[in-house]
Regions:
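HIT superfamily nucleotide-processing domains
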Residues: 1-148
Length: 148
């Protein structure tokens, strides 16, 4: 049996879950900014960081890395990723995005589609190491109805 963890969503609601990605895929929790899903992947706004357009693209099954994708998942992934990125540009006007594959998980492959806004560069710089301070700033200062 998987150990449960307590998470706190961007509204301050606490939930006990074993696997956040499974809880999202099975709709046991509803993340803010729920987006379309594909046959093999789910996309949603980050559960704790209220930056508009910050998308987590996660596998529906338990894998950690792209080298575990089936052929069908490989094809679905690139098409879904392209569709999400296009929507970020067209709907939100996001011109720059950092794609970060994070294998620091026990359960689901996931990739961050992290939008780069002018305020981030002004406050924290442009380099990749500026992402964490921008996320922390958003958690502390951007929990507004508009960003949820």
């Amino acid at each position: 049996m998987q150990k449960k963890s307590e998470i706190t969503d961007i509204n301050g609601t606490k939930k006990d879950i074993a696997c956040l990605s499974c809880a999202i895929v099975n709709r046991n929790v509803t993340p803010p900014g729920a987006l379309p899903v594909s046959d093999f992947f789910d996309a949603h706004q980050d559960y704790e960081v209220p930056i508009p357009g910050f998308i987590i693209l996660a596998s529906k099954r338990h894998i950690q890395s792209v080298d575990e994708f089936t052929k069908e998942e490989q094809q679905d992934f690139i098409q879904f990723l392209s569709r999400l990125r296009k929507a970020m540009r067209e709907s939100l006007g996001i011109e720059k995005v950092e794609l970060i594959q994070d294998e620091d998980t026990r359960h689901h492959f996931h990739m961050w589609l992290f939008p780069r806004y002018d305020w981030m560069e002004e406050k924290f710089g442009r380099k990749i190491e500026s992402i964490r301070p921008a996320m922390k700033y958003a958690q502390e200062n951007m929990k507004t109805e508009e960003n949820l």
